[in-house]
Structure formats: C-alpha cells, structure tokens
Curated annotation (Swiss-Prot):
GO cellular component terms attached to this protein's record: cell cortex; cell division site; cytoplasm; Golgi apparatus
UniProt keyword annotations, A-Z: Golgi apparatus, GTPase activation
GO terms of biological process kind: intermembrane phospholipid transfer; small GTPase-mediated signal transduction
A single MF term (Gene Ontology): GTPase activator activity
Species this chain originates from: Schizosaccharomyces pombe (strain 972 / ATCC 24843)
Identification of the protein by name: Putative Rho GTPase-activating protein C1565.02c
C-alpha cells in the first residue's frame, strides 16, 4: 500500500518560500478500490505525516481529473473531518487543478461547512500553466499522468517564444557542461540497460513534446517516470537539433578516404577525429558512446548490439544529404560510417578526448569494466 500512497500523495517540490509542496493526484485513487474510505484516509494521513512535520508550513496541490472512483463528496467530508489541527492550521494554500464536475460539487459542498479562514486558502485553476503563475514549474516535479491530461486542456504550458534560446539548439562549442536533458536522459537509460529496444523503439509524440517543453523552459522533470524509451527519444532529438551535427560532412567524407588508405585503421581514425572534431564535440561523443557501450553489454536482454545501435542512432549524429545511403544495410561490412560507429561504441574510452569534468557525467554501471585499449 505504501508504494500506491507515494503515487497518490508526495512531495512535488518547494514553493516560493521554500516550503514543501504536497501534491495529490486523485486519478490514482483508483489504486485503492479494495480499501474502504476510513482505512484509506487513516493510511493517507499517516503517509502525509511522514512527509511533513507538525510544525511545518506547506502548500497543497490537488490534480482532480478523473476523480470519480469513490463517492467523492463522502470521501471529501471524511478527509476534512479526519484532518488534524496541524495540517489544517499550517497549510498556506490549496490549489485545485483539472477539476471535473464531481470534484467541483464535492469541494464546494465541503467548503460550505469549512471555516472561512480555511475556505480562503482554496484556489481553482484550469491548467498547469495557471499553476506556474503561483508555483514555478522550475520548483515542481510532476508525474506524466498530470501532463498528459493537461494536453487536453491546453496545447502547451508555455507560450511560444521564438527569440528564446533553446536548450536544444545551443551550439556544442559554447557548452561549459552537458545540458540537463542529456545528463538526466543518460542517467535514466543507464538504470534500465536491460530494457528491450533502447534507441530502436520510440515513445509517444505527446510524451516527447512534453519533456522537450519542460527542459526547454528550465523546469524540473521526472524523466525516470516517463521511462527509458522516452529518455532515448529525448537524446536522439537533442542530437538532431544541434545547429551543427556531431559528425560533419567533412568527417564523413574522411571516413571513406581513411578506410581505403591502407594505414592502420585506429591510427588513421584518430588523426581524422583530432583534425575534424573540436574538443567539445569529442567530449560529447565520448559521453554518448560510453552509454552506447554500456547498452551493448546487456544485448542479450535488450537485443541491441553495436550494429543495431549504429543503425538506430547513427542518423541522429549526421545531417548528410545521403544519410540513407550511409546507413544502408547493403555491404554493411564495407560501409565506412556504420563501421566507424560500431568501432567507436567498442573503443569510446580511447578514441575521444576526455576531460575529468565531463567524465563525471558518464553514468556508471558497476557491473561493467571499461573497454580495453585496442
């Protein structure tokens, strides 16, 4: 029951006074169908008391969509009467978002018997964008289910601002550190290396649009809740959105020349990388290829070996006009780009320039050893 209570009620972040924000997602009441109201309310308040101390001030946020599982009015009245003095006294504000007709009737009936002081703390909001005016989303981490429903209310949380600098189009050469979207995406994937189809499967377009908008506007993102496939889609989007691709046309042309040169491939490739890729691009390549290497170490579970990964994520690293030809399955063993990608996955640790500050962002899989020097 504790796990379900954590999905129903949790600390979502902090308000402008740095006090805790308790988030309640009433849609998740459906997890408690087998419990009667009295026991549910008792366990819920026990759970809340673990989240906040009796002398702590806090803000409450209720997401009330699809909240018709129980007799909502009866449940609301029992919850109000079961609320202890400290919870009642210390709540600073109660925001109710995405209300349906049943929750509106229930809450308005409840407030008719509540004290005027308590009633004044309630505020009804239509959408997450309205909530953002009172509690910035940079302070809140909300679950996917809330954002999914909000898309039925508004097409976007933030107004379009073409003049704003997007996290996804900032030149790599100007980065002082990897963007949060990449770092957190890699962390989520590294925790789920056994998931089948990493970088091959795609998440829903709705989920991808949501996480892009949140990262692009400096919000907290519970990316782990969206899942590893969404994290992979986000990473691919980031690389596709770079002003200059990770691997330039010059680099791709050089792959063919160096492959046919008769010189030792490792030596030839290293010279090409040093000549064609700036330091930040090499550090970025080192990050992503370290993750791809980790994925290959679980290929029996995730069905993604170096060859599959090269075919699935390779197009995101280049904007070449002939990318389809570059990624062709025909004569794959002689395909310079595919051959390079597979080689880079296996030898990332020695191939690309490293820097301690950037290497600290590489997610660590303790079950693996670093690849050996070729």
């Amino acid at each position: 029951m504790e796990h379900d209570l954590e999905r129903l009620c949790f600390i979502g972040g902090y308000d402008n006074d740095n006090d805790k924000v308790i988030v309640v997602v009433t849609k998740n009441l459906e997890l408690f169908k087998k419990y009667d109201d009295i026991n549910l309310i008792k366990e819920a308040y026990n759970h809340v008391h673990k989240l906040i101390q009796k002398d702590e001030r806090y803000t409450a946020v209720f997401f009330a969509h699809d909240s018709t599982v129980f007799s909502y009015l009866g449940l609301s009245l029992k919850a109000y009467y079961g609320m202890d003095y400290y919870l009642h006294k210390n709540v600073k504000a109660v925001y109710v978002i995405h209300t349906d007709w049943m929750s509106k009737v229930a809450i308005r009936t409840l407030l008719s018997i509540a004290s005027p002081k308590f009633t004044r703390k309630f505020r009804y909001l239509n959408s997450i964008s309205d909530l953002n005016k009172y509690i910035p989303l940079s302070h809140l981490k909300l679950p996917p289910i809330v954002y999914e429903f909000d898309r039925n209310v508004e097409p976007a949380i933030f107004p379009s601002n073409p003049s704003a600098t997007s996290n996804f189009i900032f030149p790599v050469q100007q980065w002082t550190r990897p963007p949060d979207a990449l770092v957190e995406g890699m962390q989520v994937v590294s925790k789920s290396l056994q998931t089948e189809g990493l970088f091959r499967k795609s998440c829903s377009r709705k989920h991808l649009d949501i996480v892009i908008e949140l990262y692009d506007n400096g919000c907290m993102v519970d990316l782990e809740a969206f899942g590893p496939i969404a994290a992979c889609s986000l990473i691919k989007h980031l690389f596709r959105s770079l002003p200059s691709p990770l691997f330039s046309a010059e680099f791709l042309n050089g792959l063919t020349d160096h492959m046919d040169s008769g010189i030792d491939y490792a030596v030839s490739l290293q010279k090409l990388i040093d000549a064609s890729m700036d330091k930040n691009s090499q550090k970025l390549a080192r990050l992503i290829f370290s993750l791809l290497y980790q994925i290959t170490q679980h290929e029996q579970e995730n069905m993604m070996n170096a060859q599959n990964l090269a075919l699935c994520i390779g197009p995101s690293f280049s904007k070449a006009d002939n990318i389809a030809e570059l990624m062709s399955m025909k004569d794959k063993e002689y395909n310079p780009y595919c051959y390079f990608l597979e080689y880079a996955i296996l030898h990332w640790n020695t191939l690309f320039a490293n820097e301690e500050n950037w290497d600290s962002y590489i997610p660590q899989d303790p079950t693996l050893l670093l690849p050996k020097t070729p």
